[in-house]
């Protein structure tokens, strides 16, 4: 069969395997690449290659992650797999590997285990929107009733964490058997399960909304005055687009927001009619004094984001080896929170029953900032102390 070339026309999604240690995440990842390689949709990647995940650094945190890519008839996927449990936690909290959906791998022989639960909870907290389940190792289970029982348990667990447990596709198979066979046909006793899984991923996980289609937001990095023209703010457009003549809202660093009109957009010293997600631009703002705008604020579509001081977050605390703290911290701890372009002091409140947080822990916490910031669910931040990063977090809910 002729080798399929990489068609850029296919929509792209980011997915990953999650689940308890030794339930077969990496074997499944290898089996997917092996199966799809038979039809030119992937380069077969061995278990060993995926398992020796290279170290990456995201916001100063060391994470081991493996990336493979493959395509089905309709889509192109980038797939992440992590060797260690801690790597998943760091990945999900820092957003190093943003997932549009994930494949939860559960061993049919063992059923849901502590990390199964933790990965589902983290997916809920950090906003992984869709989960497809692969019940693995069915070659080790003789009793069909046991399979039903495990499926029921998994569905209940998903529902408990507010995923649609009754509607989520649950596929069954043996990643190892499919990998060992490797014929990749839909008729094969073992390889067909990999195809069933990919069909479910294709149909159940929807295409993500593109950044450019979301409401406009640009973190302000710098502000200056152009004599005779007015105040210019510069920054990189995070999402959406802005056209000359659009009304925008200045949000953050103050209780009140301020609406103004964008009267000019320029990039690389050229004037534009509009700018969109990913562009580094300068925006001219009508009637705004230079003293009214500062780094740390954002320009946004009016009404799309509010300045807030109180929110809940899921946080990973760096280990001493990662350059973090050497000692635990307690409730009432007052570090700096770095959002987008600026540091703001905040006070940490730990959940009931949690006395202290050790380096290397991940924890849910409530945070009260001393200055309002434009905050929304899913926003990532770093926790800093004396200029060094000691934690990474993601906003899970707002306390207005």
Swiss-Prot record:
Keyword Nucleotide-binding: yes
Keyword Cytoplasm set for record: yes
Catalytic activity from the UniProt record: GTP + H2O = GDP + phosphate + H(+)
Superkingdom of this protein's organism: Bacteria
UniProt-annotated stretches for the region G4: 136-139
Region described as G1: 19-26
UniProt-listed SUPFAM superfamilies: EF-Tu/eEF-1alpha/eIF2-gamma C-terminal domain (SSF50465), P-loop containing nucleoside triphosphate hydrolases (SSF52540), Translation proteins (SSF50447)
Stretches the record annotates as G2: 60-64
Renumbered residue ranges of the record's region G3: 81-84
Cellular localisation: Cytoplasm
Record's keyword terms, sorted: Cytoplasm, Elongation factor, GTP-binding, Hydrolase, Magnesium, Metal-binding, Nucleotide-binding, Protein biosynthesis
EC annotation from Swiss-Prot or TrEMBL: 3.6.5.3
Entry's Gene Ontology cellular component terms: cytosol
Amino-acid positions noted as binding Mg(2+) in the UniProt annotation, renumbered to this chain: 26
A UniProt-annotated Pfam family: GTP_EFTU
Residues binding GTP: 19-26, 81-85, 136-139
Leading EC class: hydrolase
Chain segments carrying region G5: 174-176
PANTHER family: ELONGATION FACTOR TU, MITOCHONDRIAL, ELONGATION FACTOR TU-RELATED
Family of the protein in this entry: Belongs to the TRAFAC class translation factor GTPase superfamily. Classic translation factor GTPase family. EF-Tu/EF-1A subfamily.
Function: GTP hydrolase that promotes the GTP-dependent binding of aminoacyl-tRNA to the A-site of ribosomes during protein biosynthesis.
Family annotation (NCBIfam families): EF-Tu, PRK00049.1, PRK12735.1, PRK12736.1, small_GTP
Assembly behavior: Monomer.
Protein name: Elongation factor Tu 2
Gene: tuf2
